[in-house]
């Protein structure tokens, strides 16, 4: 039987643990993402995402097809809209990390959405060709400061701790696992101490013996993470943004040198 795909057709959609809107949100899909359909139940589809994460998504939030969506451009602004080509009627909102099939035109881009509808946007679209540096990763990470915490979130509408880290690295075409414990396990051969961490390395924290939180290292003991909202805090007890709870829960850090090369 030919493989079927669920092409996400809204800027951000929740993916649930069960085929029920009342069940837990486990993660999110972003506009343009093509998910592999592995099962269905009524109006719901069980899908696998690019990072191996699976869950249930409602039929109204995407297109079921035997082809992946031909996206060639990424949204690099925090928000935007797609309007009908013939007017100002908004047909889709946009957020950072959405991917679209589009081409440049004067003052913006013409786009074809996953359902085939055509529109126009002035939102900044492009391809990430910049080779990531530790500085560029931190610059991007800081641009999300203030975004609220959202369990399962992986967009500027709301991030959870690991969704924040995954989004930052995926922007530079570097794919990380979805959850904090998976990220920790992925880099288990690259563990370092808190003091050895450079900016853009990862700090991991445990609760009850299990890894439950991740943060992005900066210099001099500072770090960025999503807890309540995306913020900068410190391991230094003399700093005004010292987080004593996380320092007590600190497990270890990992170097990102294996994927950054620096």
Q: Language-model features: where?
A:
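Active-site nucleophilic cysteine motif
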Residues: 141, 153-172, 177
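Short, surface-exposed loop/turn motifs that are enriched in glycine and acidic residues
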Residues: 127, 150-158, 190
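...with weaker cross-activation on analogous glycine-rich loops/strands in unrelated enzymes
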Residues: 175-232, 236-238
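A structural connector/turn signal
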Residues: 24, 89, 189-192
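Boundary regions of SH3-family modules and the immediately adjacent low-complexity/disordered segments
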Residues: 1-4, 20, 27, 31-42, ...
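Short, basic/aromatic beta-hairpin or loop at an interaction surface
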Residues: 5-16, 69-82, 170-184
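Aromatic- and glycine-rich peptidoglycan recognition patches
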Residues: 64, 127, 190-191, 218-262
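Structural motif
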Residues: 12, 44, 108, 221-222
């Amino acid at each position: 039987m030919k493989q079927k795909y669920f092409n996400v057709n809204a800027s951000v959609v929740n993916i649930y643990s069960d085929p029920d809107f009342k069940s837990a949100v486990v993660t999110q899909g972003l506009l343009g993402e093509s998910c592999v359909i592995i099962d269905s139940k009524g109006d719901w589809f069980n899908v696998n995402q690019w990072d191996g994460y699976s869950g249930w998504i409602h039929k109204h939030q995407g297109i079921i097809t035997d082809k992946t969506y031909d996206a060639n451009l990424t949204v690099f602004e925090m928000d935007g809209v797609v309007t009908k080509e013939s007017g100002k009627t908004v047909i889709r909102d946009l957020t950072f990390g959405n991917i679209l099939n589009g081409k440049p035109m004067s003052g913006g881009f013409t786009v074809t959405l996953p359902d085939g509808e055509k529109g126009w946007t002035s939102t900044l679209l492009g391809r990430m060709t910049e080779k990531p540096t530790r500085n560029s990763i931190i610059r991007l990470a800081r641009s999300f400061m203030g975004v609220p915490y959202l369990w399962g979130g992986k967009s500027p509408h709301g991030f959870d701790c690991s969704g924040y880290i995954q989004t930052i690295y995926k922007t530079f075409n570097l794919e990380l696992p979805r959850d904090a414990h998976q990220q920790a396990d992925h880099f288990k051969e690259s563990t370092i101490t808190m003091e050895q961490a450079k900016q853009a390395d990862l700090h991991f924290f445990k609760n009850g013996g299990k890894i439950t939180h991740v943060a992005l290292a900066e210099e001099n003991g500072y770090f960025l993470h999503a807890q309540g909202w995306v913020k900068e805090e410190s391991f230094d007890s003399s700093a005004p943004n010292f987080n004593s709870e996380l320092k007590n829960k600190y497990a270890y850090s990992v170097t990102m040198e294996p994927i950054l090369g620096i």
